[in-house]
């Protein structure tokens, strides 16, 4: 592995005995699985591995060398991996379903999603409409000075426009307003006020000239703004456009300087500030921004916000400072900035040239070399907006109840393994340990899809306000549908939550989630596919791949952030101080370990602080999924013989298959520009390190491959938490 270990790591202080070590009277036997699914799995591994490499020296190259060689990054992508290939497959499948959906045997809401997709795909109608629908949108928001000759700010009220785009589009510039569970009373939804996201990366915005690479990205962003304005107003003065673009970037830079970086927001006590709207008015120290009026504009169709209404204010200083900044800023700059953020989010839904502008910026930012096809854009967009309706189509065709039950059983086996880990660790006091076990037992498993989407009446009721789709006027339909979908979330304000029915995702998604405020894991149907899961293949592979994904989300309940919430997801400190100190010491081991790695393409060190939660989860996932696999062997034994399924044509043992199943899902390559971006901002480490670092911390891996102590894959010093 082409990385350098630069600092000493924490020494493992304890180790739990695996089930295989505790029951030596069972005879272990292997049998080759020759079923079609096992033959497919064997072929996939053989085509991925470079067996000329010593696995104890460079396991990533051993597991992934051939896969990387055979899979160059496509021009339109910033990265390629088996997970990306799975995502592509799901999108292709969904696109075919949406193209061919008819009124026969489909719920009304499902047909609306198909019509929406087909309208999105009508490139000719888009070009006929041109940019006029976008210009009309911006006009309704007070105009965009860059594209509006003679614009006057005399009657422009930026607060009203921010509230309007928040309500109608879910776009939240300057101030982020959203409805979510109250983190300290998760049975109820509450209004949340937070710092906004930006059009450019925070690090670049804070210091616009910090490096030649930053200057290149900022220049690309500036060109993106100017080119977009030119599409709306071809006759605009170039000097004025350049000046406006510079003012937008400088204003956004100041916003970013007021913001708090993500690694400083991992402790909930830093952002959970519950108070009344009247108190927000006081602590933000202003008389020119009326919070009650602003929030009632956001929540226009819903119960009235009063001065005594409680909200959560995340960032007091940011909010106070940006309100003062906005008050002192020329209305033209405010209107240009808000209009730009709207245009950046929605412009590419109009003409081909807008999509070209977006591509030119992404070419600089993340290194892609070709624009993504419209079909891919429309599929992803439709899933994002009407995901439950699309998900219904997907699960009806591509997910069986048999598979769901099989994976549910796998989840419970990993939960049992985790419970064993908690019971047997030596660093937790018994009070904290018991509370951790209570939380684990209360953790909700949301598998594949919410059951209510299978009921036509319930699904139609959920989307009842979605209007009929006009295929000739896609952008108009987009605005109407978006407003309805955003109203569904805003409409939850002041209503109770439902830990079972409320999902954080929709079914046709290739990802997995842990939600701290509901203490629940979600595994959408999209991710429950090969190469992560295959019904009937070697259990070692399933436990190593989808089992590790499950273990990863389960571990999030006990990482540096998830560990701050109780079994119902409320912010509660349930740790005794001595145990908390030991937890922090072990978490610091991971911070130092990952920060010591140098990513060779970018010559950048990993950010062990921002990624610590994900790294804790990756390491806990591998350890507990392996324990669960061993437990599975015990439970499936017959006449005191544990039969391990191996694969044809491979000399790998079942234990080795487990670790190959884990690492091969992280095979891949990523463009340098994208890697630079992800190392700065992503809470996950790059795939190569996810594939390997948890294995260097695993004694079971070293035993499976016979790696001597002190080899790269079995270092003397290891980090261990769960």
UniProtKB/Swiss-Prot annotation:
Zn(2+) binds at residues 552, 556, 614. Glycans are attached at residues 100, 184, 207, 424, 609. Its cofactor is Zn(2+). It is an enzyme of class 3 (hydrolase). One of its GO terms (molecular function) is metalloendopeptidase activity. Expressed by the venom gland. SUPFAM superfamilies: Metalloproteases ('zincins'), catalytic domain. Its EC number is 3.4.24.-. Binds 1 zinc ion per subunit. InterPro entries: MetalloPept_cat_dom_sf, Peptidase_M13, Peptidase_M13_C, Peptidase_M13_dom_2, Peptidase_M13_N. Disulfide bonds join 33-38, 56-707, 64-667, 120-378, 589-719. GO terms for biological process: protein processing. Belongs to the peptidase M13 family. This is Neprilysin-1. It comes from Trittame loki. The lineage of its organism: Eukaryota, Metazoa, Ecdysozoa, Arthropoda, Chelicerata.
């Amino acid at each position: 592995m082409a990385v350098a270990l630069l600092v000493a790591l924490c020494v493992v202080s304890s180790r739990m005995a695996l089930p295989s070590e505790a029951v030596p009277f069972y005879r272990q036997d292997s049998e080759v699985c020759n079923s079609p699914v096992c033959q497919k799995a064997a072929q996939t591994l053989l085509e991925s591995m470079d067996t000329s490499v010593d696995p104890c020296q460079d396991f990533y190259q051993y597991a992934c060398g051939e896969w990387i060689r055979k899979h160059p990054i496509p021009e339109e992508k910033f990265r390629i991996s088996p997970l990306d290939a799975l995502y592509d497959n799901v999108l292709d499948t969904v696109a075919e379903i949406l193209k061919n959906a008819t009124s026969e045997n489909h719920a009304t809401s499902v047909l609306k999603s198909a019509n929406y997709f087909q309208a999105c795909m009508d490139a000719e109608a888009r070009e006929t409409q041109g940019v006029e629908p976008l210009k009309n949108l911006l006009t309704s928001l007070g105009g965009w000075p860059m594209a509006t000759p003679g614009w006057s700010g005399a009657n422009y009220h930026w607060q009203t426009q921010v509230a309007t785009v928040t309500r109608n589009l879910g776009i939240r510039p300057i101030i982020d307003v959203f409805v979510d569970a109250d983190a300290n009373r998760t049975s109820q939804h509450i209004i949340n006020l937070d710092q906004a996201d930006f059009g450019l990366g925070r690090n670049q915005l804070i210091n616009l000239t910090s490096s030649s690479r930053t200057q290149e990205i900022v220049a690309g962003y500036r060109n993106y703004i100017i080119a977009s304005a030119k599409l709306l107003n071809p006759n605009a003065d170039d000097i004025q456009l350049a000046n406006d673009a510079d003012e937008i970037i400088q204003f956004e830079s100041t916003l970013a300087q007021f913001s708090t970086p993500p690694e400083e927001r991992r402790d909930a006590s830093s952002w959970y500030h519950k108070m009344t709207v009247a108190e927000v008015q006081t602590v933000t120290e202003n008389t020119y921004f009326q919070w009650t009026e602003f929030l009632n504009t956001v929540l226009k169709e819903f119960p009235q916000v009063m001065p005594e209404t409680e909200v959560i204010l995340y960032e007091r200083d940011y909010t106070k400072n940006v309100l003062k900044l906005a008050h002192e800023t020329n209305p033209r700059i405010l209107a240009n900035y808000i209009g730009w953020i709207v245009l950046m989010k929605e412009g590419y839904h109009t003409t081909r040239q807008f999509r070209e502008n977006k591509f030119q910026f992404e070419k600089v930012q993340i290194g892609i070399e070709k624009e993504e096809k419209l079909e891919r854009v429309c599929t992803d967009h439709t899933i994002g907006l009407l995901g439950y309706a699309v998900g219904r189509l997907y699960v009806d065709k591509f997910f069986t109840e048999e598979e769901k039950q099989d994976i549910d059983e796998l989840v419970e086996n990993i939960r049992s393994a985790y419970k064993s880990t908690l019971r047997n660790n030596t660093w937790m006091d018994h009070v904290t340990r018991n509370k951790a076990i209570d939380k684990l037992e209360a953790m909700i498993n949301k598998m594949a899809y919410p059951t209510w989407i299978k009921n036509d009446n319930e699904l139609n009721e959920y989307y009842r306000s979605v209007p009929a789709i006009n295929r000739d006027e896609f952008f108009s339909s987009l605005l109407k549908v978006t407003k309805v979908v955003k109203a569904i979330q805003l409409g939850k304000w002041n209503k109770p939550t439902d830990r079972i029915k409320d999902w954080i995702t929709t079914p046709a998604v290739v990802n997995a989630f842990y939600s701290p405020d509901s203490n629940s894991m979600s595994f959408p149907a999209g991710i429950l596919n090969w190469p992560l899961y295959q019904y009937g293949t070697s259990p070692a592979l399933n436990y190593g791949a989808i089992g590790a994904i499950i273990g990863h989300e389960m571990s999030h309940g006990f990482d540096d952030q998830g560990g701050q919430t109780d079994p119902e997801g409320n912010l509660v400190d349930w740790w005794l101080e001595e145990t908390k100190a030991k937890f922090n010491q072990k978490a610091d081991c991971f911070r130092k370990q990952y920060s010591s790695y140098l990513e060779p393409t970018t010559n950048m060190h990993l950010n062990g602080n921002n990624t610590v939660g994900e790294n804790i989860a990756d390491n806990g996932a591998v350890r507990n999924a392996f324990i669960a696999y061993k437990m599975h062997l015990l439970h499936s034994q017959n006449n005191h013989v544990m039969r391990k399924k191996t694969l044809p044509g491979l000399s790998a043992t079942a234990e080795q298959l487990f670790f190959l199943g884990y690492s091969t899902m992280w095979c891949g390559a990523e463009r340098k520009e994208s890697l630079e971006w992800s190392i700065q901002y992503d809470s996950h480490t790059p795939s190569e390190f996810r594939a390997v670092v948890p294995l260097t911390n695993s004694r079971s891996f070293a035993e499976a491959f016979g790696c001597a102590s002190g080899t790269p894959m079995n270092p003397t010093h290891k980090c261990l938490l769960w």
